[in-house]
Curated annotation (Swiss-Prot):
<feature type="domain" description="Ig-like C2-type 1">
    <location>
        <begin position="29"/>
        <end position="115"/>
    </location>
</feature>
<dbReference type="GO" id="GO:0044291">
    <property type="term" value="C:cell-cell contact zone"/>
</dbReference>
<dbReference type="GO" id="GO:0001501">
    <property type="term" value="P:skeletal system development"/>
</dbReference>
<feature type="disulfide bond">
    <location>
        <begin position="268"/>
        <end position="338"/>
    </location>
</feature>
<dbReference type="InterPro" id="IPR007110">
    <property type="entry name" value="Ig-like_dom"/>
</dbReference>
<dbReference type="GO" id="GO:0003179">
    <property type="term" value="P:heart valve morphogenesis"/>
</dbReference>
<dbReference type="Pfam" id="PF07679">
    <property type="entry name" value="I-set"/>
</dbReference>
<comment type="function">
    <text>Has a negative effect on cell proliferation.</text>
</comment>
<feature type="glycosylation site" description="N-linked (GlcNAc...) asparagine">
    <location>
        <position position="255"/>
    </location>
</feature>
<feature type="topological domain" description="Cytoplasmic">
    <location>
        <begin position="400"/>
        <end position="504"/>
    </location>
</feature>
<comment type="subunit">
    <text>Interacts with FGF2 with a low affinity.</text>
</comment>
<dbReference type="InterPro" id="IPR052615">
    <property type="entry name" value="FGFRL"/>
</dbReference>
<dbReference type="Pfam" id="PF13927">
    <property type="entry name" value="Ig_3"/>
</dbReference>
<feature type="glycosylation site" description="N-linked (GlcNAc...) asparagine">
    <location>
        <position position="293"/>
    </location>
</feature>
<feature type="glycosylation site" description="N-linked (GlcNAc...) asparagine">
    <location>
        <position position="231"/>
    </location>
</feature>
<feature type="disulfide bond">
    <location>
        <begin position="172"/>
        <end position="221"/>
    </location>
</feature>
<keyword id="KW-0393">Immunoglobulin domain</keyword>
Amino acid sequence: MTPSPLLLLLLPPLLLGAFPPAAAARGPPKMADKVVPRQVARLGRTVRLQCPVEGDPPPLTMWTKDGRTIHSGWSRFRVLPQGLKVKQVEREDAGVYVCKATNGFGSLSVNYTLVVLDDISPGKESLGPDSSSGGQEDPASQQWARPRFTQPSKMRRRVIARPVGSSVRLKCVASGHPRPDITWMKDDQALTRPEAAEPRKKKWTLSLKNLRPEDSGKYTCRVSNRAGAINATYKVDVIQRTRSKPVLTGTHPVNTTVDFGGTTSFQCKVRSDVKPVIQWLKRVEYGAEGRHNSTIDVGGQKFVVLPTGDVWSRPDGSYLNKLLITRARQDDAGMYICLGANTMGYSFRSAFLTVLPDPKPPGPPVASSSSATSLPWPVVIGIPAGAVFILGTLLLWLCQAQKKPCTPAPAPPLPGHRPPGTARDRSGDKDLPSLAALSAGPGVGLCEEHGSPAAPQHLLGPGPVAGPKLYPKLYTDIHTHTHTHSHTHSHVEGKVHQHIHYQC
């Protein structure tokens, strides 16, 4: 039967109400409020950049500046739950800031461009102790400017670890008026290595090659001119080849279950002396080796290498990486491995992904089956009955069309002539009809077109036993009664009962 239109209107709200609100809200992070992409800050002031994102589960936020991750080592920067706070803004703080929020269903980025304005008028800078000496000041001194670093984004990483035999470059590119000079020191002592005496155009970079353990220490660049001085310090750790292989910390990755077509993720945290290589692998199930161009062996099993995203450096010295799986299918189910490797070896940990079956498997449209069952019962019964009636009528017509016309009755026997095949009575030697004649019966000359028997010519007629291919069956019961009188003759009384059954 056809569903009611009212039911069709009420069905979607009922289905939506069957799911709890919490389940319906789960998904990737989304914006909770609008933001102004261009932010302006005054030199020396404090600026706050908001990251108004929300999601279920709550997302993990990470801030970057010009592509470099902001961590606790940045003294003037503080990552707060509401956003990023920058104190005592400097000129080099200008740049592109990105807040990236990630949960198990996806990620969202909020971008800012920070512009730093200098509200200090030229000529009001302190000129140093020698400014109080007498004499005529150079008119150009009114435009003097203290040195400043021009590439602060390349100086964020102040703690550097390198193995023996490697190299490192320390940069302190600066500008000012007059043109500043730079001096490199190690552990507060002037450098005597040849690397410190490079050509003028490379003086802003200190290159340390073929590192040795004694190269470990604090390296400081001091940039100065008549207007002032600035400095920056790097800590270099030269380690004797990595002492241990990476270690996977925490409980991740963990076994995960996802709905068909849903989104989920695995995460992996690796602790290593140097930045490790983190790679995700998926085990190739038996019989599916031909689907992949290349596989690798790990622990005696075959795995396929999956695309791996960025490796994030955390303030505690560990490294984090996530594997995102979208639009999960049955092929995505199986064992996944997080592999962390460095020059000393590798460590791995496995987890399983379970993909729930598709609640709506492909099949024939439901409307076709419902329309077939919605027919009224009289129609369902009447169609087969009509077909049977038409078929019976056709069969009857064919049966009548194949019947032959009436056959003429046989001629009566000549008087005094004994037909062959007659028998004698035991007592009176009277003639009796033969079984063949009786079996032929008086119905030999029946007209089959009318379906009624013709009157017999003679009970013992010798007519030939022949009939059409389609003929009525004749069953004859003969009851013979013999009465013996005192006279010498016998009387035969024959009673014939004919049962005619027409069969096509």
